[in-house]
Amino acid sequence: MKEVKDFYDKWEPEDFPNYIKLLMNFADELIFEEISLLLKKFENKKDFLVLDCGCGFGAFYNLTKDFNTIYLDISLNLLKRFKLKERKICANILHLPFKDNTFDLVLCINVLEHVNYLKALNEIRRILKNKGKLIVVVVNKDSLIKEEIFNDFKIFHKPLSIKDFEIDGFKIVYSNSVYFLPSIFKISPPIILSKIIEYWKPVDKKLSKIFKNKGQFLIIEMVKE
């Protein structure tokens, strides 16, 4: 975990080339919209205690800002850049500093592919209440798209598949995937790439329905059993 912490302590996405920022923002937008739909059923449960596990600098803060949410990340650098001033904790997902059966919902976006995911899932299960929900997003091992900017990391990085989450203690209640943009488009000048992305978005949604779990990012909702 030290190499993961060190990597994200030096994480400076604003220095990335424009095409990478465009693709990352597009991926985040697709993920955000998908999870927003999953969270709609909890709209009347504002007293839910939620953990955003691996919150980074708060890219997905708007998903959980209306809940009673704690934001956790291993990188102090990222947490310092998170605009929220409170309810932030710097900690390791493999050793979560919470009592058993604490949370109603855990959100874990693009984290498990960088750690011992089974150990992390065991920790998350420990802190979830009975029948508590877990929503995860990971880089998909079974993706039809192999976009290198989401795979070529300088740290441990293991894409995961839906089968990796068929484990004791959790039941999968929903799965889908997003991001089917062909890699060839990234050679386009940024101004053209931004237009391509704009027109591709409805296409991506259609492909997500046709190729349910074959997109670049796998989204899974699980319940603690």
UniProtKB/Swiss-Prot annotation:
GO terms for molecular function: methyltransferase activity; S-adenosylmethionine-dependent methyltransferase activity. InterPro entries: Methyltransf_11, SAM-dependent_MTases_sf. It holds the Pfam family Methyltransf_11. It comes from the Archaea. This is Uncharacterized protein MJ0638. It comes from Methanocaldococcus jannaschii (strain ATCC 43067 / DSM 2661 / JAL-1 / JCM 10045 / NBRC 100440).
